[in-house]
């Protein structure tokens, strides 16, 4: 009898202990404060270098991705820096060897490129900008716009230095901070350090490109064909240097802009310039070099990932922020778990890398759209019900992560479109050069682009917009090249190139 009671007592003790333990464990999970930030590939992506506060130092990690300590005489970026107005100085440049930047600060203002061109009397600034844009796209002469021709002549020394700089081999652009921001101030009052970086050289090249193209089109209009090509080749070389390494998406956008503008100008020179075979072959070599750029996926997986995770760490794990009410006492159960948004960020960034790595345009766009649709659905989804014994900080963290990523994660489709448009522009220019070389050799256009292989093209190029061979047809003795949808006979588009009419001694401009 006593033995049976002892056994029952032991059994009930075990059952009650198990129930109490399970309830206690779940109650602790419910009321426990969120864990600290975990340094791991799943959350912070990098585990070193670490800053003194123990958090990943994304800024130092970014600096290791770019070449540094390139001598000024070999650094094409230093040539651009010399021409930028002195509102930016080397004092706020982040560079391992800023000596050449300091020396560039001593260049007299008279030798720098004055931007924008001052409007003549009676002309509004908007009209000046419109005229400059037009003159950068089509041939013109000094008599057409004397004020613009004088301005280009006044800045000829600066433009010559810009063109000479593109022939340097190295590329080490400075990264600058606002004058009131120190590189040791990782968590600023408004923006994290990486998002505060400015790109003065790349930004200047974007604005300088129209000026260089305006001079190129003037040279073409006045018969200086080689001078016109020299300026266009300058932009191709700068774009090539920027895009050779997987930089930020902003830098990549600048490179694609330079490529698209230079490719359009190249087609103008080819069709208006009556070139010889040697110069056409030189154009093709430059165009081929430009097309060989670093994959977009590498940019997303390096600079964009570092920058975004730096921002998320600043938002959710900044140790310098004042302690919030949610971090005090019992309210800690409502505090945010920084690991949740960082893990979500890495998951979506990895999906963006996979999308950019897809082999066809349709697959890339479809994968990119799926990411955007999921982010939008999560952002607008109603808050889910908390499960029994689910920690409150999980609910709070999940809700904040959904809203934040939907607003801040960079869109991929715009970069994909920029890449495809620039690629198509370069391919069309290359094919136009090959067609002109074929015409010089045979006196007539080929029946198909396959006839250009292998003498003038290594293979028939694919259209980046359709993943099929680039469009080509002959009608009434005149050839047409296009990228994308088949154009109408009178369609005007940057991705449509028309050759000379069969009975025309002159070669018409690209529409």
Residue ranges and their predicted role:
Residues 2-511:
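Short acidic linear motifs
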């Amino acid at each position: 009898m006593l033995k049976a009671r002892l056994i029952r007592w032991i059994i009930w003790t075990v059952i009650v202990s198990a129930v109490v333990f399970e309830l206690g464990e779940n109650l602790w999970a419910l009321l426990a404060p969120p864990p600290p930030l975990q340094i791991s590939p799943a959350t912070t992506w990098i585990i070193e270098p670490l800053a003194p506060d123990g958090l990943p130092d994304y800024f130092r990690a970014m600096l290791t991705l770019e070449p540094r300590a390139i001598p000024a005489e070999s650094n094409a970026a230093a040539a651009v820096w010399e021409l930028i107005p002195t509102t930016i100085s080397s004092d706020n440049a982040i560079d391992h060897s800023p000596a050449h930047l300091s020396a560039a600060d001593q260049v007299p203002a008279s030798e720098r490129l004055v931007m924008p061109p001052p409007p003549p009397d009676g002309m509004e600034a908007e009209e000046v900008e419109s005229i400059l844009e037009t003159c950068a796209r089509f041939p013109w002469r000094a008599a057409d716009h004397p004020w613009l021709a004088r301005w280009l002549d006044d800045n000829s020394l600066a433009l010559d230095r810009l063109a000479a700089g593109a022939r340097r081999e190295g590329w080490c652009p400075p990264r600058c901070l606002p004058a009131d921001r120190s590189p040791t101030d990782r968590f600023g009052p408004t923006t994290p350090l990486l998002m505060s970086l400015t790109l003065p050289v790349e930004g200047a090249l974007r604005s300088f490109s129209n000026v260089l193209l305006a001079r190129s089109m003037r040279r073409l209009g006045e018969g200086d064909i080689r001078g016109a090509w020299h300026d266009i080749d300058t932009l191709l070389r700068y774009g090539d240097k920027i895009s050779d390494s997987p930089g930020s998406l902003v830098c990549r956008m600048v490179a694609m802009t330079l490529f698209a503008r230079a490719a359009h100008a190249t087609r103008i020179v080819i069709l208006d310039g009556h070139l010889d075979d040697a110069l056409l072959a030189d154009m093709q070599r430059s165009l081929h070099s430009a097309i060989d750029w670093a994959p977009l996926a590498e940019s997303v997986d390096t600079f964009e990932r570092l920058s975004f995770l730096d921002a998320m760490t600043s938002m959710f794990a900044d140790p310098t922020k004042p302690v919030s009410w949610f971090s005090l006492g019992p309210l800690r159960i409502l505090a945010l778990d920084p690991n949740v948004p960082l893990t979500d960020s890495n998951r979506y960034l990895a999906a963006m890398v996979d999308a950019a790595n897809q082999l066809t345009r349709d697959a890339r766009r479809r994968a990119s759209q799926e990411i955007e649709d999921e982010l939008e659905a999560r952002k607008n989804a109603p808050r889910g019900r908390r499960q029994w014994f689910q920690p409150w900080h999980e609910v709070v963290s999940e809700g904040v992560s959904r809203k934040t990523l939907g607003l801040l994660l960079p869109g991929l489709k715009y970069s994909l479109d920029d890449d495809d448009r620039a690629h198509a522009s370069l391919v069309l220019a290359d094919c136009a050069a090959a067609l002109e070389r074929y015409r010089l050799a045979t006196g007539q256009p080929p029946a198909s682009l396959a006839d250009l292989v292998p003498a003038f093209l290594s293979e028939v190029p694919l259209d980046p917009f359709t993943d099929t061979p680039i469009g080509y047809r002959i009608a009434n003795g005149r050839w047409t090249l296009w990228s994308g949808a088949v154009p109408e006979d009178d369609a005007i588009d940057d991705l449509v190139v028309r050759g000379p009419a069969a009975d025309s001694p002159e070669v018409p401009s690209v529409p």
